[in-house]
Amino acid sequence: EWYNTLSFCDGFSLSIAKEKQKLPYHLNIIDELHINENANSRILYKLLLYKNIEGKYEILESLIDYIKRNAHSSEFNNIQVKKPCITQEIKRIDLWVRDKDYAIIFENKIYNATDQDAQIARYIDTTIDYNYKPENIFIIYLPPFSSNEPELNSWGKYKKDFEKRYINLSFRNNVLPWLENDVLPLINSND
């Protein structure tokens, strides 16, 4: 009986190996390079900086359109990309998009880093210090999975005030599909 079980396992293992050989080669460069959250933010930053030959921030506009389609609030409809200042790791904010009439704070948690005490609140306060009204500040949280939400203490006094100007865009459910479906078609084959 043991012999039959071992023979079955050997045959099954061989079948799995043959089926794996039929699959296309899979390589995730980001994982292989052991890129951390800062490097991940840098990649997103570079994408958002892209301007087409007409000077439009095509990828940033695409992301804003994606957010407008998927947000639980119409508040995001007030965002109009004009002449954004896009920065990375300024004032400890992972990504920061500031335009004349709005500011967007991106908090990247792709590797499940824990929120610091009052982290989002500090970023909101910093943005207010740059003369943005709270009603014109938006928060985009970027965790690996949509079930990951900011810790309550990260919000400080702002959680309720920002619930309509906050969106959780998980890398798995939102960012990757947006890149595949919305960004990839924008890329010129010469770029």
Predicted regions and their residues:
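Charged, terminal alpha-helix-loop-beta segments
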Residues: E1-D191
